[in-house]
Curated annotation (Swiss-Prot):
This is ATP synthase F(0) complex subunit 8. GO terms for biological process: proton motive force-driven ATP synthesis. It is found in: Mitochondrion membrane. PANTHER family: ATP SYNTHASE PROTEIN 8 (PTHR39937:SF1). Keywords: ATP synthesis, CF(0), Hydrogen ion transport, Ion transport, Membrane, Mitochondrion, Transmembrane, Transmembrane helix, Transport. Component of the ATP synthase complex composed at least of ATP5F1A/subunit alpha, ATP5F1B/subunit beta, ATP5MC1/subunit c (homooctomer), MT-ATP6/subunit a, MT-ATP8/subunit 8, ATP5ME/subunit e, ATP5MF/subunit f, ATP5MG/subunit g, ATP5MK/subunit k, ATP5MJ/subunit j, ATP5F1C/subunit gamma, ATP5F1D/subunit delta, ATP5F1E/subunit epsilon, ATP5PF/subunit F6, ATP5PB/subunit b, ATP5PD/subunit d, ATP5PO/subunit OSCP. The chain crosses the membrane at residues 7-24. One of its GO terms (cellular component) is mitochondrial membrane. The gene is MT-ATP8. Belongs to the ATPase protein 8 family. It comes from the Eukaryota.
């Protein structure tokens, strides 16, 4: 069964993870977020109950 032979697939997996970790990840981390986190407490609004016309 060729899929049990790890020789070709292990090197492909290692090269893929190294590419992700060394090339792509630093480029992705330089992007700024569109909604930066703030230190303000989030304001929660109390929802008003629905006024059903038949009750």
């Amino acid at each position: 069964m060729p899929q049990l032979n790890p020789a070709p697939w292990f090197s492909i997996m290692i090269m893929t993870w190294l590419t992700l970790a060394l090339l792509i990840q630093p480029k992705l981390l330089t992007f700024t977020t569109t909604n930066p986190p703030s230190s303000k407490p989030s304001l929660t609004t109390k929802p008003t109950p629905w006024a059903w016309p038949w009750t």
